[in-house]
Amino acid sequence: MVGETNFGREGRGDGGATVPGGGGNPPGTGPLAGVRVVELAGIGPAPFCGMLLADLGAEVVRVDRPDGAHLIDDGRHDLLGRGKRSVAIDLKDPRGAAAVRDLAATADVLIEGFRPGVAERLGVGPADCAARNPALVYGRMTGWGQDGPLAHTAGHDIGYIAVTGVLHSIGRAGSPPSIPLNLLGDFGGGGMYLAVGVLAALLRVARGGAGQVVDAAIVDGTTHLATFVHAMLAAGRWRDERGANLLDSGAPYYEVYEASDGGYLAVGALEPKFYAEFLRLLGVPPEVGAREPDRWPELRETLAAAFRTRTRDAWATVFADSDACVAPVLSLREAAAHQQLAARRTFVTVDGVQQPAPAPRFAGTPAAMPGRPALRGEHTEEVLLEWGVANTADLLASRVVVQRQEHVGEQVAVDTASR
């Protein structure tokens, strides 16, 4: 079975598998085993790309600032740092930049999420690194892209998706746009697209081509994600307004309904045969459930009234194992216990922290469960020596690079730079 092939762990009662922690991934596992990646530390999409590559078996080394801080910096919960090793290097010191170039010289990939021009000013830009490693794939993650009138301005996910038209399209009729967390821009249109670009460029190198720069912009990726909606719009089958279409809460049979206990059910009964099954199980006569658009408001009220007669879980039992396309809306903490996710071990537990398992799954080159997130500077000395960085001892003594050892959860740091 695929789940057993990939994970091979006994499931917990909470729907996850329990595996031991440890910085970095076991060697030689996953389809990207043997691929070396240098990640210049940042937040959001670039670290997510690094996590994806690590989950697939790549050896990922994150370059942290010695005095920097992560959004989540306790050594256990920074899940975007899982499966990576960390080196702490002062990039503002020319000797630190030289150390990063040494790392890049033996790497397959470097990824960074700085504003355009910052990496160049630090001496670790594409030209600096390619001079020693022409096969290097250099991945760049930004919101606006490397060029254009806004390229050098600040921004965040919500602003990037706002100008693409996608944010405008999410929400209910007559209401402001709904904020889809930062999943759509930062991660879907950002880090995921950077990973796709990096993998495509790696394939090119494997076939004898040269390394190259991958310019991944959240505005580009988010726009690309919306290709289907643009196709519907061009075909005259989509109205450029919220809550008026088949898939945006306009249609009452693609909607979320409240149950008697305040829980919710998600309905996606689009196809006629699935819709007929949905009406039967809900107890709504077919003639009452007619789907013509001019009857949508009346139909929505009918369906809402029916759902209010039972609790969320009672309705989930009614629709279980059917083709009605109805599912309970679960919270983040409830999700791991869902029978399908539990059966597939979609969640795992590492060092006591429940988290999503790597995806997708590979029958021939299964990925190992991720190691715990690296502490800042935890692997500085071992990585620099292992990767052949010149003058490692001098760099440690001068504090250009810092080796730190911490007990996870206790945050007791031992600075070994002066050993």
Please tell me what each predicted stretch does:
Residues 55-87:
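Glycine-rich phosphate-binding loop and adjoining beta1-alpha1-beta2 segment
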Residues 78-97, 102, 160-168, 353-367:
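Redox-cofactor-proximal catalytic regions of oxidoreductases
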Residues 38, 79-131:
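A structured beta-alpha segment of the ubiquitous adenosine-cofactor-binding alpha/beta core
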Residues 77-81, 154-159, 232-233, 343-346:
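Short, hinge-like loop/turn segments at secondary-structure boundaries
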Residues 46, 96, 118-120, 146, ...:
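Short glycine-rich, flexible loops that bind phosphorylated cofactors or substrates
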Residues 25, 52, 56, 106, ...:
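Active-site-adjacent "lid/gating" segments in soluble enzymes
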Residues 1-67, 132, 137-139, 224-419:
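Acyl-CoA thioester-binding alpha/beta core of soluble enzymes
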Residues 42, 91, 115-116, 142-143, ...:
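Short glycine-/small-residue-rich Rossmann-like dinucleotide-binding loops
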